Amino acid sequence: AFGSRRPTTTATATTSNNNNNDDNNRYTRAQSGSSAQPHQMKDMWEAYVSTNQRFTETVREVYEDGDMIWVHGYHLMLVPLMIRAYLPNATIGFNMHIPFPTSEIFRVLPWRREILMGLLGADFIGFQVPGHSRHFVHCCTRVLLGTSSIGAAQISYRGRVTRLLVCECCFYCIHCFECCFYCSLF
């Protein structure tokens, strides 16, 4: 039913398969959930960006026309926009496996704009529960002033529309992504 555009697993990039151990250590430390001191934040952000760039490069190397790209997890929130810069016509989905914070919490992050713009590079963003999707919409409309919410299920930013979906059934629900892509054809 989905033709040749059916999602496929084409690559798995991991931070452990590259030679930049210093970046890996900084990235792992930043993602470990430990609290960061203010003087460490710039260093951790640079490692985060670098790791997202490496994932993007891996996708670019294996991408073939018609592939769907599905990115998973908060540790790769910049990847959709990075991929979009190289592959403007690619179909990109992103799945957020953790709660998305409220705008009151999110607005204190120094790189809040970059994170939101990174996510909005996706065609679809999946959340676990409706409240997390609402938090994302509120963050976008408050932080990215040019953003508009099209109902509760879509965000428009800089001429692109990103669809939001809620899939409570499981963490890796490829069926939800397939359905979203299929419905977008009509």
Model-derived segments and spans:
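Catalytic cores of carbohydrate-active enzymes across secretory and cytosolic contexts
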Residues: 1-12, 17, 23-176, 183-186
